[in-house]
């Protein structure tokens, strides 16, 4: 049986994804969940265990560091560590584990905010907004590179 692996399962999108998954899944979380198969890991400070992606066919990477009331310039390393380094670490582990699909939920901040009443298109100039947007954009670019080099299917939402 191939599993679905979900990071960010406790968030708004993650909770809905869990309800929509038809089949077995495993989550990565800072705390053990009584109702889910859980890999306990804090993306701010830990290495994702190698066995986390055993028998996984698809990864949904929803976790990220986004909202903080502190001055972003004083914690930019935390944004980078969670949004870029942990994402790359997870994608590289996915390749090593034979994962076929990697779905990354990014942010509108990675492309910049369109003017009111308009939408961004794939041909628009990318202008990430703030440290959050910059780190999400960097993660997108690194994931595309990993996917191209490895053959793993990468989708960015």
Predicted regions span which residues?
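Conserved Rossmann-fold NAD(P)-dependent oxidoreductase catalytic core, especially the SDR/UDP-sugar
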Residues: 88-131, 147, 155
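Active-site helix of classical SDR
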Residues: 135
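Conserved beta-loop-beta element that borders a ligand/cofactor-binding pocket
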Residues: 141-157
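SDR active-site strand-loop-helix element
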Residues: 7, 28, 59-63, 102-107, ...
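NAD(P)H-binding glycine-rich loop region in Rossmannoid oxidoreductase-like domains
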Residues: 43-82, 93-96, 111
């Amino acid at each position: 049986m191939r599993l679905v692996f979900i990071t960010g399962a406790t968030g708004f999108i993650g909770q809905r994804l869990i309800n929509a998954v038809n089949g077995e899944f495993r989550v990565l979380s800072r705390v053990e969940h009584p109702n889910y198969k859980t890999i306990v890991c804090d993306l701010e400070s830990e290495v994702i265990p190698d066995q986390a992606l055993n028998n996984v066919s698809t990864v949904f990477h929803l976790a990220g560091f986004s909202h903080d009331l502190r001055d972003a310039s004083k914690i930019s390393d935390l944004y980078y560590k969670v949004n870029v380094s942990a994402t790359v670490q997870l994608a590289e582990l996915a390749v090593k584990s034979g994962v076929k699909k990697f779905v990354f939920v990014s942010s509108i901040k990675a492309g910049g905010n369109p003017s009111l009443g308009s939408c961004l298109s794939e041909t628009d100039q990318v202008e990430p907004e703030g440290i959050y947007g910059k780190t999400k954009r960097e993660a997108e670019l690194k994931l595309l590179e990993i996917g191209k080099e490895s053959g793993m299917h990468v989708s960015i939402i």
